[in-house]
Amino acid sequence: YLDHWLGAPAPYPDPLEPRREVCELNPDCDELADHIGFQEAYRRFYGPV
């Protein structure tokens, strides 16, 4: 299977992953993140990362 690795845990957990998921679920934040990066987009919508 080509996607067998998707279920594997990341070797180094990303402490920002929960915030990244919040931003991805907000279409406006997700779109802005594509242009200016996740951390800056999150900050604009939700405050400091």
Swiss-Prot record:
<dbReference type="GO" id="GO:0030500">
    <property type="term" value="P:regulation of bone mineralization"/>
</dbReference>
<dbReference type="GO" id="GO:0005576">
    <property type="term" value="C:extracellular region"/>
</dbReference>
<feature type="binding site">
    <location>
        <position position="21"/>
    </location>
    <ligand>
        <name>Ca(2+) 2</name>
    </ligand>
</feature>
<comment type="function">
    <text>The carboxylated form is one of the main organic components of the bone matrix, which constitutes 1-2% of the total bone protein. It acts as a negative regulator of bone formation and is required to limit bone formation without impairing bone resorption or mineralization. The carboxylated form binds strongly to apatite and calcium.</text>
</comment>
<dbReference type="GO" id="GO:0032869">
    <property type="term" value="P:cellular response to insulin stimulus"/>
</dbReference>
<dbReference type="GO" id="GO:0007420">
    <property type="term" value="P:brain development"/>
</dbReference>
<feature type="modified residue" description="4-carboxyglutamate">
    <location>
        <position position="17"/>
    </location>
</feature>
<dbReference type="GO" id="GO:1903011">
    <property type="term" value="P:negative regulation of bone development"/>
</dbReference>
<protein>
    <recommendedName>
        <fullName>Osteocalcin</fullName>
    </recommendedName>
</protein>
<feature type="binding site">
    <location>
        <position position="24"/>
    </location>
    <ligand>
        <name>Ca(2+) 2</name>
    </ligand>
</feature>
<dbReference type="GO" id="GO:1900076">
    <property type="term" value="P:regulation of cellular response to insulin stimulus"/>
</dbReference>
<keyword id="KW-0091">Biomineralization</keyword>
<dbReference type="InterPro" id="IPR000294">
    <property type="entry name" value="GLA_domain"/>
</dbReference>
<dbReference type="GO" id="GO:2000224">
    <property type="term" value="P:regulation of testosterone biosynthetic process"/>
</dbReference>
<feature type="modified residue" description="4-carboxyglutamate">
    <location>
        <position position="24"/>
    </location>
</feature>
<keyword id="KW-0372">Hormone</keyword>
<dbReference type="GO" id="GO:0050890">
    <property type="term" value="P:cognition"/>
</dbReference>
<keyword id="KW-0106">Calcium</keyword>
<keyword id="KW-0379">Hydroxylation</keyword>
<feature type="domain" description="Gla">
    <location>
        <begin position="1"/>
        <end position="47"/>
    </location>
</feature>
<feature type="binding site">
    <location>
        <position position="30"/>
    </location>
    <ligand>
        <name>Ca(2+) 3</name>
    </ligand>
</feature>
<keyword id="KW-0479">Metal-binding</keyword>
<feature type="binding site">
    <location>
        <position position="24"/>
    </location>
    <ligand>
        <name>Ca(2+) 3</name>
    </ligand>
</feature>
<dbReference type="GO" id="GO:0008147">
    <property type="term" value="F:structural constituent of bone"/>
</dbReference>
<dbReference type="GO" id="GO:0001956">
    <property type="term" value="P:positive regulation of neurotransmitter secretion"/>
</dbReference>
<feature type="disulfide bond">
    <location>
        <begin position="23"/>
        <end position="29"/>
    </location>
</feature>
<feature type="modified residue" description="Hydroxyproline">
    <location>
        <position position="9"/>
    </location>
</feature>
<dbReference type="GO" id="GO:0005737">
    <property type="term" value="C:cytoplasm"/>
</dbReference>
<dbReference type="GO" id="GO:0007611">
    <property type="term" value="P:learning or memory"/>
</dbReference>
<feature type="binding site">
    <location>
        <position position="17"/>
    </location>
    <ligand>
        <name>Ca(2+) 1</name>
    </ligand>
</feature>
<dbReference type="GO" id="GO:0032571">
    <property type="term" value="P:response to vitamin K"/>
</dbReference>
<dbReference type="InterPro" id="IPR039176">
    <property type="entry name" value="Osteocalcin"/>
</dbReference>
<feature type="modified residue" description="4-carboxyglutamate">
    <location>
        <position position="21"/>
    </location>
</feature>
<dbReference type="GO" id="GO:0005179">
    <property type="term" value="F:hormone activity"/>
</dbReference>
<dbReference type="GO" id="GO:0005509">
    <property type="term" value="F:calcium ion binding"/>
</dbReference>
<dbReference type="InterPro" id="IPR002384">
    <property type="entry name" value="Osteocalcin/MGP"/>
</dbReference>
<dbReference type="InterPro" id="IPR035972">
    <property type="entry name" value="GLA-like_dom_SF"/>
</dbReference>
<keyword id="KW-0964">Secreted</keyword>
<keyword id="KW-1015">Disulfide bond</keyword>
<dbReference type="GO" id="GO:0042593">
    <property type="term" value="P:glucose homeostasis"/>
</dbReference>
<dbReference type="GO" id="GO:0031214">
    <property type="term" value="P:biomineral tissue development"/>
</dbReference>
<dbReference type="GO" id="GO:0060348">
    <property type="term" value="P:bone development"/>
</dbReference>
